[in-house]
């Protein structure tokens, strides 16, 4: 009875992971050997605020869920923490910022963007891109610049007339 219950739990876990992996635009796999529970919880809290999932998953279950979700095949070994979400840039930034703080205990091992394997260097390059919010701010600044310059010009003209 106990084994049947455990098997059912694993089947449900794989089905749940599969449904989440299908929707994810990015999936990163990291080694977290030696990282304290407190620090892993801090990572989870940061991730949760950005809509990113963080979970330690048995490699065999993760492999099955990834395969069923259509991801390219990865050779999963040792202990892994899986991070996934819909924003590749935010996820990459989160992982590399955390890795800088904990370089001896947290290392990116593999990355998948849109279900295709990408190199660690590629993920690092993506982490250096501006976020969606930063890009929107830049665009807004470009759009408002002509009006800002026009108003500044009118103000300078008014000041020049007042001086004369």
Curated annotation (Swiss-Prot):
Classification via Pfam families: Ribosomal_L10 (PF00466)
Annotated coiled-coil segments of the chain: none
Entry's Gene Ontology molecular function annotations: large ribosomal subunit rRNA binding; structural constituent of ribosome
Keyword hit for Protease: no
Alphabetical list of InterPro entries matching this protein: Ribosomal_uL10, Ribosomal_uL10-like_sf, Ribosomal_uL10_bac, Ribosomal_uL10_bac_type, Ribosomal_uL10_CS_bac
CDD domains: Ribosomal_L10 (cd05797)
Keyword DNA-binding listed: no
Swiss-Prot/TrEMBL keywords: Ribonucleoprotein, Ribosomal protein, RNA-binding, rRNA-binding
Any one GO cellular component localisation term in the record: large ribosomal subunit
GO BP term (any one): translation
NCBIfam families: PRK00099.1-1
Subunit structure: Part of the ribosomal stalk of the 50S ribosomal subunit. The N-terminus interacts with L11 and the large rRNA to form the base of the stalk. The C-terminus forms an elongated spine to which L12 dimers bind in a sequential fashion forming a multimeric L10(L12)X complex.
Free-text function comment from the UniProt entry: Forms part of the ribosomal stalk, playing a central role in the interaction of the ribosome with GTP-bound translation factors.
Family, similarity comment: Belongs to the universal ribosomal protein uL10 family.
Name recorded for this polypeptide: Large ribosomal subunit protein uL10
The species this protein was found in: Helicobacter pylori (strain G27)
Lineage of origin: Bacteria, Pseudomonadati, Campylobacterota, Epsilonproteobacteria, Campylobacterales
Encoding gene, per UniProt annotation: rplJ
């Amino acid at each position: 009875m106990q084994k049947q219950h455990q098997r059912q739990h694993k089947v449900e876990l794989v089905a749940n992971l599969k449904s989440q992996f299908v929707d994810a635009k990015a999936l990163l796999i990291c080694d977290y050997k030696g990282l304290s529970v407190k620090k892993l919880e801090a990572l989870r809290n940061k991730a949760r605020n950005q809509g990113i999932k963080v979970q330690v998953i048995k490699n065999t279950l993760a492999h099955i869920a990834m395969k069923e979700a259509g991801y390219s095949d990865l050779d999963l070994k040792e202990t892994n923490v899986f991070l996934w979400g819909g924003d590749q840039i935010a996820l990459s930034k989160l992982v590399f910022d955390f890795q800088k703080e904990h370089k001896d205990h947290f290392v990116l091992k593999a990355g998948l963007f849109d279900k295709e394997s990408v190199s660690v260097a590629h993920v690092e390059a993506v982490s250096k891109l501006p976020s969606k919010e930063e890009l929107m701010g830049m665009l807004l600044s470009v759009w408002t610049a002509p009006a800002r310059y026009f108003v500044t010009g009118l103000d300078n003209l008014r000041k020049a007339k007042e001086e004369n």
